[in-house]
UniProtKB/Swiss-Prot annotation:
UniProt-listed InterPro entries: DNA-dir_RNA_pol_bsu_ext_1_sf (IPR042107), DNA-dir_RNA_pol_bsu_external_1 (IPR019462), DNA-dir_RNA_pol_su2 (IPR015712), DNA-dir_RNAP_su2_dom (IPR007120), DNA-dir_RNAP_su2_hyb_sf (IPR037033), RNA_pol_bsu_bac (IPR010243), RNA_pol_bsu_CS (IPR007121), RNA_pol_bsu_protrusion (IPR007644)
Ranges of compositional bias, category Acidic residues: 1088-1115
Enzyme Commission number: 2.7.7.6
Keyword list, A-Z: DNA-directed RNA polymerase, Nucleotidyltransferase, Transcription, Transferase
Any GO MF annotation of the entry: DNA binding
Domain of life where this protein originates: Bacteria
Name of this chain's protein: DNA-directed RNA polymerase subunit beta
Biological process (GO), any one: DNA-templated transcription
A Gene Ontology cellular-component term: DNA-directed RNA polymerase complex
Disordered: annotated segments: 1084-1115
Catalyzed chemical reaction(s): RNA(n) + a ribonucleoside 5'-triphosphate = RNA(n+1) + diphosphate
Amino acid sequence: MFYPVKVGTRERWSYSRIREVLDMPNLIEIQQNSYQWFLDEGLREMFRDISPIQDFTGNLVLEFIDYSLGEPKYEVEECKERDVTYAAPLRVKVRLINKETGEVKEQEVFMGDFPLMTTKGTFIINGAERVIVSQLVRSPGVYYSESIDPSGKKVFGATVIPNRGAWLEFETDVNDNIFVRVDRTRKLPATVLIRALGYATNGQIAELFDDNEHIRITLERDNTESAEEALVEIYKRLRPGEPPTVDSARSLLEALFFDPKRYDLAKVGRYKLNKKLKLSVPTDVHHLTKEDIVASLRQMLTLMSGEGHKDDIDHLGNRRLRSVGELLQNQFRIGLSRMERVVRERMTIQDVDVITPQVLINIRPVVAAIKEFFGSSQLSQFMDQTNPLAELTHKRRLSALGPGGLSRERAGFEVRDVHHSHYGRMCPIETPEGPNIGLIGSLSTYGRINPYGFIEAPYRKVNNGQVTDQIDYLTADEEEKFVVAQANAPLTDDGHFIEEKIDGRHGPDFVLVAPERIDYMDVSPKQMVSIATALIPFLEHDDANRALMGANMQRQAVPLLRTDAPYVGTGMEYKAAKDSGVCVLASKDGTVERATAEDIIIRHDDGTLEKHKLLKYLRSNQGTCINQRPIVMKNERVEAGQIIADGPSTDHGELALGRNVLIAFMTWEGYNYEDAILISEKLVKEDYYTSIHIEEYEADARDTKLGPEEITRDIPNVGEDVLKDLDERGIIRIGAEVSTGDILVGKVTPKGETELTAEERLLRAIFGEKAREVRDTSLRVPHGEAGKIVDVKVFTRENGDELAPGVNELVRVYIAQKRKISVGDKMAGRHGNKGVISRIMKQEDMPFLPDGTPVEIVLNPLGVPSRMNIGQVMETHLGWAAKALGLRLATPVFDGAQEEDVFATLRKAGLPETGKTVLYDGRTGDPFDNKITVGYMYFLKLHHLVDDKIHARSTGPYSLVTQQPLGGKAQFGGQRFGEMEVWALEAYGAAYTLQEILTVKSDDVVGRVKTYEAIVKGENIPEPGVPESFKVLIKELQSLGLDVRVLSENDEEIEIREIDEDVTETAKELGIDLHEDLPAPVIHEAGEGEDDEYFEEDEEAVDDEPMTFDDDDME
């Protein structure tokens, strides 16, 4: 039934029936291999392409010979601390040859700091950890299409798409004429282009295409007689209005398609062309040849005759991946080509005798291109670091968006849909919900990238019905030709199929064939899904929509204080945690010499010592806590690759995103209506779901026009009680508890001298006292925040820290909060079953089992049937049995516990086979009417915490134009009393309440002050005035040239003034600063959308770059 499997240092009992024939690859190798290729070969290719650079006379030649990367200035951790980029200096050996004098100068030139990839597959840019996402783009090559014209006739098209350069398109019309478009200009008869290539006579052209009738029809439309005429005709289309000559036309055509500098098919484009057109052009020819153009047209004629088939753009054989290395190379190429221009210019300007390579080369364009890519490219993303799974998935993400890709608005249904070629390459489950659905995917577990950028999936070779252990990696194109059996096809011990007919896939079709017809077999049932999806037990019993939510929500689980690996796992937990890079691994065999919370020292068998420093309480990108704990003891033996310390969300080397809790599926007093969740106070008391969150605040002392700011303890008008936790410098001490409004860093800013009265001036003159004119600009704890100070960092110019211009001192304060689970927090299981906590109930009032154990969570049974995620029920049953047996179980996706296994395990544990039991009401002790499903389910606390969302405002910033409060928590805004709310008050006839809300509580500036005065003096509230937004409306209408006046009932014009003088007077009397409501930097109106910090760094929020090809091509 089940058997023990060793995962790391722990045992899991697995239900898997299928033998693993292939180890899963390293899960972040897609990033590492690509970057390594770039360092080893990509850079060399670039320098080879650009070298040599000659001046216009051909006299000076600049060659790039070799390059080397130096040592990075700071280590990874230090880079994060100092807010700098983790990079190494790139030095290039350059040779300058003067052909006139034969003089050769060689120099090593510094070409800027090049960002390095960390061992975890990320980059540190300005102290923030970022990931470069791989991009799915159309592969260069030739594509054939066929469509039905409105007249009902089939029309055909062929497009040759290069990596960079002009497009070449052939198309037919209703009369079977064949046209060509060069670089999206107007159509020409296709034979004009063929003639221009040197096939001058009609006879030659007809012969070239075996006297094809379509070519004959096209020749009749073709007015050109010779190659020269054809060249001129093409030139006229490409450069209308310029006088055509045969030479200029020839050189233009040469440059368009046959010049390697202007036209590049790339290695992959040449490979695809040769493969599709059955050519044998050498692979290093990356431009078009005459044969290519003729063969692509010939292939289209074949398609027109009814043979062959059109291409499917969404097939993964026609889409390739641009990973880090290639994306970086493209950026570097842009930088180098800009630099090349500068070098050429300088060669002509500078004096030949004193010229050196150093003088010629300007590295600024190269550095800028790289910086821009890492800092602001759509594919360079702030790493999702909520938990280890989020990190891992982010590095394996495949995006069809970004420069040169699709745009969200333009992408139709077909592009987003699951395609049969995704099998084993791209997960059909894991993709975001919302506008990016289907455009962003995740690499499958066993998928790997081949040198051409196509995703390959592994299969076991089958010879004459016998499955061998030979493993072949196939691209989507290659797989089309074969019949592939599923991984769960039953086999004999020597690898023959047991059944007489085998289920298989052949291209898009499912077939039932004899064993001899099978060519390949899947290596594993989980090869079609991604890592996150492979972590869902009983995935096969869940509806796809809910599985998608389950996979996505696991990435949002907050690392908990006490981790606990699931009782019911899938066996993937260990691999995911190990490859995510959050755990510490032993590099060689040895013995543990010392293991403390700070570090682990291992003595290797060869006698050397290795010290592993552990990360303690660091802030992740998302504000969750990164902390490592040793899991080995002194004198323990360790092997190479063994996990010796747990990171966040890991438990003994296994991924542990949540906790195992006892749940019951029942309704309870309406507290679990609409997916709400009722939890026991035990989860709060025993810190089941307590997590640590760390926020970072910084204060900088700058130079201002009136003098430098100063970080100090001496703050004007502040009592000693407020300063009690500040040290002598005015910076808060570590360990202090702070809450809203407390000073973290005392800082004063010089104020301009104010006008003094005569008396004051006299006193000043006598005593020589210059008033200390400073104002308090201290860093305080924002609204709604509180916690303990865990770390303080001070950076100053004197200590040689790199600070922004104008900043003399920078202080960073880290505040940690322990957040227990509370009402309003979002929780979820792994099956897309999410809900919000509606009530936390006393332990003694919760329903309890016959043995007196109270349940910990009560879920609504109605959440299961309509959503069809039965996996959660299976997990609950099996979890109960696992707890009773004291085991941890593994039920891998598509190869896990069957229904019978679950019943048998329940029997073995001595539990009722139905998985149901009588529950008793904790308040009365009476049994509930029916038996209830009870068991252990793995439940996660998600990053949508109520503490981050709850918000209240009394007085705060107002928008400058409308004078209405801003919106959103981030702006400390108010709650919008919107159109529908106004209707509600209108419906009740609550006229005065409504008037108040629309005027004095909002944007009647005069009324605001007068109302305040009335409240202070205890008088009646005065009549409201004119709202500011009404004045804005009038001004806008007047700006359109409309004469708008406001009349009273008696047709007298009402003058709408600016803020009244008397109000200003009154304000002075009351000591109110009318402008204090405006924050120091004026905040302009916030957008309509809700402000949620989580989405600030989300790729969905970033605007797409404009796309390069037009609608016709997208069709």
